[in-house]
Amino acid sequence: MLKNGVISDTAKRAIAGMMKLAPSITAFGNMNPTSYLRLVPHQEAPTNVCWGDRNRSVLVRVPLGWASKTDLCKQANPNEQKSAYDTHQKQTVEMRSPDASANVYLLMAGLCVACRHGFSLKDGLAVAEKTYVNVNIHKKENSKILKKLDTLPDSCAASAECLQKQRKVY
């Protein structure tokens, strides 16, 4: 995920795939009608198709906390011994829309397909750049950025339609 302490182009391509397939991924990650009660603007759960690092207003968050040379495990658990592993290469991403109704097997398979799709996109890096957000998109001063972003489906039926439209990728 990281190259010289920054997110790599390979990781950006994987994220681009997640951005492209985010609408249909909700069909696997939000499988009942009540799931969509939390997917409303200005709540903790994301509603817009975007990503960022250390940003809780985005759909795919790259924490980047592991990118530092600090042993975060040791910081969080002071009574533990220092990790013997080089943790700065242990980068993660978070897809923040799924909830407890998710079919974890279909969701993980969908995310894998999305990453693979991102690797094959000719414009993958451009997609990643276009959907990258480094501000809280819910603040009033960032409303122009918010308006440029696609939104996630707002119901099971809308998610199913998105899955139907993108089914060839799967």
Give the positions of each predicted feature.
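C-terminal accessory/tail domains of diverse enzymes
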Residues: 2-170
